[in-house]
Amino acid sequence: MGAYKYIQELWRKKQSDVMRFLLRVRCWQYRQLSALHRAPRPTRPDKARRLGYKAKQGYVIYRIRVRRGGRKRPVPKGATYGKPVHHGVNQLKFARSLQSVAEERAGRHCGALRVLNSYWVGEDSTYKFFEVILIDPFHKAIRRNPDTQWITKPVHKHREMRGLTSAGRKSRGLGKGHKFHHTIGGSRRAAWRRRNTLQLHRYR
């Protein structure tokens, strides 16, 4: 086994004495820092490399702190108006994961960079911490490499806002097989539109 495989196995045993101590100390350290800051290097080099990170120019790691829990509806004094079915304010659950929220915040802060992927690095009772891999699309090392040229194209601007990253795709219900019938055709909306459109063919 290579070194990265050993690191991977260490991270799989998060309840071991060593990892519990490490995660507690790291959470304390991350809480002292700002909610969004640049990390000098990935905390989990094995995971970062599996997600596409390379230790070379053009790659950046940002660490994001996201508050845990559901999403409260942002209305003044709970005044939602309308019908009682839509009066809920407190016990609502956000459709996307906290990881995708972290990616979005990193993408907003670093508007010139492209979000490649992200991974979990720790959590406590109040916060979850994620590290986001960002790429500089105008760096020559990225533009000249055939493996990374794809992310320099304009179509990949703010892919984290449009649910195109790995964490973003998970909440869209995409997949193959009988469990994913509600997104046949590319999205929930496409599936709904096809099922709710009456087609009267000329020859039927």
Curated annotation (Swiss-Prot):
The gene is RPL15. Component of the large ribosomal subunit. The ribosome is a large ribonucleoprotein complex responsible for the synthesis of proteins in the cell. It is linked to Diamond-Blackfan anemia 12: A form of Diamond-Blackfan anemia, a congenital non-regenerative hypoplastic anemia that usually presents early in infancy. Diamond-Blackfan anemia is characterized by a moderate to severe macrocytic anemia, erythroblastopenia, and an increased risk of malignancy. 30 to 40% of Diamond-Blackfan anemia patients present with short stature and congenital anomalies, the most frequent being craniofacial (Pierre-Robin syndrome and cleft palate), thumb and urogenital anomalies. The modification Phosphoserine is found at S34, S97, S100. It comes from Homo sapiens (Human). GO terms for cellular component: cytoplasm; cytosol; cytosolic large ribosomal subunit; cytosolic ribosome; nucleus; ribosome; synapse. Component of the large ribosomal subunit. Interacts with IFIT1 (via TPR repeats 1-4). This is Large ribosomal subunit protein eL15. Residues 165-186 are annotated as: Disordered. NCBIfam families: PRK04243.1. Belongs to the eukaryotic ribosomal protein eL15 family. Its main location: cytoplasm. Disulfide bonds: none annotated. Pfam families: Ribosomal_L15e.
